[in-house]
Amino acid sequence: MAAAEVFGGCVLEGSVRVSGAKNSTTKLLVASLLSDRKCVLRNVPDIGDVRLTVELCRSLGSIVHWDKQAEVIEIHTPEIHMSEVSAQFSRVNRIPILLLGALLARCPEGVVVPCVGGDAIGERTLNFHFEGLEQLGAKVAYDGHGYQAAAPKGLIGAYITLPYPSVGATENLILASVRAQGRTIIKNAALEVEILDLILFLQKAGVEITTDNDRTIEIFGCEDFYEVDHWVIPDKIEAASFGMAAVLTGGRVFVENAEQHLMIPFLKTLRSIGGGFSVTETGIEFFYNEPLKGGVVLETDVHPGFLTDWQQPFSVLLSQAEGSSVIHETVHENRLGYLRGLQKMGANCELFYQCLSSKACRYATGNFPHSAIIHGVTPLKASQLVIPDLRAGFAYIMAALIAEGGPSLIKNTQLLDRGYYNWVDKLNSLGAKIHLLSLDPVAF
């Protein structure tokens, strides 16, 4: 396992380029399996989840050429050679579950995918996926090792209402509907920018697909596809992460390729606590503007709300903001466990099982620590921490950048490689002092 020695007391200054979005690239690669035509993706980040998805597609029959220097992937899947996804992809991330929709579209006689993995931030149940696929005519079963699905009569368009605007379920049902007979309507769909990027990609491929502001997506089944050349949107999570690190350390960083329209809720909240930013045609400059002011209620939500993946790094900012602030996590029920690591560093925060905001969320009656109060300002001290998940990992790195009393040892940093391209070199180029280490697993 990997680890990093992170020295505190640095001020981040300079320029950094944000990469293509992880959560878009991986889904577009899966979407390419729907077509037997060539697809070209540009602005592709060389990160763990993308590498894994490429290998997954290759295992199914895709021909992939990846020019990593040019950040371009050319993928062509004239035939699906295997409709059973190898167990080697079990429990590593959540991409395999999307293959139920994509592979059923081309192999309705039956597909098998392994159990999913990903960040340990809650149950993230798959019921919405399975119920929607069954409405399209599929039969789905779980045997303890993976999921089997078949559509003996083929997939048939349907009217589907999701109980919650789940991103993964929306993506899966879109993929399954592309080759289904007739029209499919998905109500209460997620409309994250990565889903809109997927819709744009499918339109280029010849699919008749539209979306409305009332969370409705309409898809007409398609059999003939076009070649696609598509530019992946910039990663709004990476852009915000570097922006927060700049403000936290009292620095000034220009994030090239950051796009304002993808980050409106984040930028609003950052400004509300005193963080500075300036938008240009080529990116966004983030800077320390004034002492940070707390007293805010930060409630995560589906788009267009405050993104759950922004929440963890933002909590470090709140630990350095004057006053008490509230976090109410409404997307994932078990995402606040990382705060115990910040407490170890000296952050003054409390976890709560009830909803601490003006409205109750779907976890109000569950026994989940999904709210927190963070009291600032509290100095942070260097510590040894183990990263529990991807975004908590960046939060720990941020905290270590301002920690007093020697370097922090942050373990499990390989999780950061899943979503942040070249993160050590990028931060060090801005003035951070981070050394990667390789530790004996026994040390964990």
Swiss-Prot record:
Subcellular location: Cytoplasm
GO biological process terms held by the UniProt record: cell division; cell wall organization; peptidoglycan biosynthetic process; regulation of cell shape; UDP-N-acetylgalactosamine biosynthetic process
Sites where the protein binds phosphoenolpyruvate: K22, N23
Top-level taxon: Bacteria
EC numbers on record: 2.5.1.7
Catalysed reactions, semicolon-separated: phosphoenolpyruvate + UDP-N-acetyl-alpha-D-glucosamine = UDP-N-acetyl-3-O-(1-carboxyvinyl)-alpha-D-glucosamine + phosphate
Protein's pathway: Cell wall biogenesis; peptidoglycan biosynthesis
UniProtKB keywords: Cell cycle, Cell division, Cell shape, Cell wall biogenesis/degradation, Cytoplasm, Peptidoglycan synthesis, Transferase
Molecular-function annotations in GO: UDP-N-acetylglucosamine 1-carboxyvinyltransferase activity
Residue numbers annotated as active site: D119
Location, primary (coarse class): cytoplasm
Pfam families noted in UniProt: EPSP_synthase
Residues given in the record as UDP-N-acetyl-alpha-D-glucosamine binding sites: R94, D309, V331
InterPro entries per record: Enolpyruvate_Tfrase_dom, Enolpyruvate_Tfrase_sf, MurA_subfamily, RNA3'P_cycl/enolpyr_Trfase_a/b, UDP_GlcNAc_COvinyl_MurA
GO cellular component: cytoplasm
Family classification: Belongs to the EPSP synthase family. MurA subfamily.
Biological role: Cell wall formation. Adds enolpyruvyl to UDP-N-acetylglucosamine.
Database matches in PANTHER family: UDP-N-ACETYLGLUCOSAMINE 1-CARBOXYVINYLTRANSFERASE
Name of the protein in its database record: UDP-N-acetylglucosamine 1-carboxyvinyltransferase
Gene assigned in the entry: murA
